[in-house]
């Protein structure tokens, strides 16, 4: 069935990615200054925030509210070049539709974090509290899969990444992406970034030790609210959801209007779009 095909495709994809992990581990060297600068929260919406769906606008507004004194930079397809240089072949492949927006965004977040550090938060992540110190002060932080032997092999989520500049894992991920796209004009697997991350962090004892230092927080509660967006709003339930996590991964593709093109009434989604949940 579909799930079995997805799992098999993921396993084959991971086998294909191993050569890039091995090459990066052999050639990587860094003597960059790893002094921690001002902590920056990075967000990106390709078309510009003014053209974003309402869900995205509310999520970004929540980050602005709970940035807790950290610098907050919102980028688009034009302003990213003020901060990073993207290889010409990656830009060309993105322009030609080979590298889709999601995978292009994967490269952008990795390049930004490798150079500057800070916290990358997808534009579809809602914050309901300040960024905790264990995130801001971590050498590397990602939400993780509590099912360590998940058949999909997806051990982390990359919609929220916090790191110091020039972190070895993040810099190696950047190199893996660059090598992969230089040699391939196809998507190995939709989740190939996550598969590559897992392979990389399991590839040497040193990298295993670095990954083991990340405080474990499951991505399951982070994704809980998405499943309840279209249910009737309940104040008590909202308190419970907020107590599960300070961050909540949503989807901008969530149906906002009913068949009469009216905002779906009395739901969590309606409250969110009206700005009542921030």
Language-model segment annotations:
Residues 1-105, 123-278:
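Glycosyltransferase-associated regions of secretory-pathway enzymes
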Residues 107-116:
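Small-residue hinge/turn detector
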Residues 116, 121-122:
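Active-site acidic Asp-centered loop
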